[in-house]
Amino acid sequence: MAQQRALETTSHNIANANTKGYSRQEAVLATTTPYSYPGMGAGQVGTGVAVQRLRRLRESFLDAQFRNESKALGRWEVRRDTLEKLEAILNEPGDNGLSKLMDRFFAAWQELAKNPDGDQGLAVRSVVRQEGIALSEAFNHLAAQLNDLTADLNTSIGVRVNEVNSLARQIRDLNAQIVKAESGNMAANDLRDRRDLLLDDLAKVVPIQVEEDRYGAVSIVVRDHTLLSGQQVNELGFDPSTGKVTWPDGVELVAGAHLYGSLEGLQEARDSVVADYKDQLDKLANYIAQAVNAQHKAGAGLDGTTGVDFFEGTDAGSLKVSDAIMGNLETIAAAAPAYDDDHNPVPPPPGDGSNALLIAQLKNGWDSNGDGKIDVVFSGEYNAWVADLGVKGQEASRMVDNQELLTEQLDSRRQAVSGVSLDEEMTNMVRFQQAYNAAARVITAVDEMLDTLINRTGLAGR
């Protein structure tokens, strides 16, 4: 029976050679209690072999290391994916990117400075207005895409919270099955494999600390709160309106000094990565609106009107060409103000495009503080954070590659311990089969001896 049980275990290993998370099992054989003959110095006679236990070949230290690296991988994968989406949204360098649109906007003012009068002047003014519309719509579109990305990240956070809760419940149920099986001296090896696989999945979502009690059940701690203890799951909650993830006691799930897991990675992407670039985009749109409006209000339109804003809005989402400009091209202030002897505004002299030139020169920089020093260069501000985005994206890609390599190496080490080698199992199968056949031959020989003893003794010579 022992050899048959060992063969069954080998068969189970072979059948699950390609099953994800399966740990190789081994039938541990031990001699049974010997029979002692009575009398002085009679000795003992062996009574055979029995399966002492079915051992699951697994290294808990390697599991802990693998999960430790998985939590870092989960965070970096989210960061890389988010930065790649940001790069796709900005579309730089590209003909329709914000950098090109800013260049075209200021180039239109440069052209207006050369041709401020007559029908040609009106035609160029129309180009200026259209380039202003294109620039403001580009800001609007980028802001909308960043808002959509934020909403998508928020949805993903809710999905991850549900995943954490689902995994915790499944692990709790497996805890109960494992404790029940092992309390009855049954091996719960396959159940433990399923639980370890769930723990691997959970470790990639949130940073976990796992402890197993003497009955075989595991408890799970996430940061400073217990997620699972015994049969109690403290499920995470998520409020889509605030974006907060909370524990049942109302305490918010807060990341530590180092971020781990895809859930914390998503929170970082939403609250830090995307939010920072959205703030910078709003800041750039506001700078352009302030700078152009300040200079535009200082100039005069074709009818001598001054003090007209070219843009309206204070951020990327609200930026637009002002209603005054949209309603009348002549209000575009290409010239310096002109006054009569009574200091009343009059139409500027022909050929004056001085104010348009000053607006065109804003491309090279703007004195936002009025101290005579240029402190804001629009293209420089934009190109700097686009370059920063590229650098951060490359860093995230490298970190993902590094973490994938580490987890693959650790998983290979785990497989060296727990994985099924078909060659080894085939060798074991032959070995156990031969032992089984030999045992059968022994039984046959004993049977023949007993037959001779019982049925044939005393028949000789008859």
Label the model's feature ranges.
Residues 1-462:
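S/T-rich, low-complexity, solvent-exposed segments of bacterial secretion/appendage proteins
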